[in-house]
Amino acid sequence: MSHNTKGQKIRLAKAHNQNQRVPTWVIIKTNRKVVSHPKRRHWRRNSLDVK
């Protein structure tokens, strides 16, 4: 992937943004009911279907 198109970069950026952990304030606000992120993606285990 040497040359990414603009659309591809935008989709990669979105995937990167979605892959962040649950914010601390959410954990505190929900009294630790929401701690994990079920859609979290590991770069080596799961592949991205970016076109």
From Swiss-Prot:
GO terms for cellular component: ribonucleoprotein complex; ribosome. One of its GO terms (biological process) is translation. It comes from the Archaea. One of its GO terms (molecular function) is structural constituent of ribosome. Keywords: Ribonucleoprotein, Ribosomal protein. Gene3D superfamilies: Ribosomal protein L39e. Belongs to the eukaryotic ribosomal protein eL39 family. This is Large ribosomal subunit protein eL39. It comes from Methanococcoides burtonii (strain DSM 6242 / NBRC 107633 / OCM 468 / ACE-M).
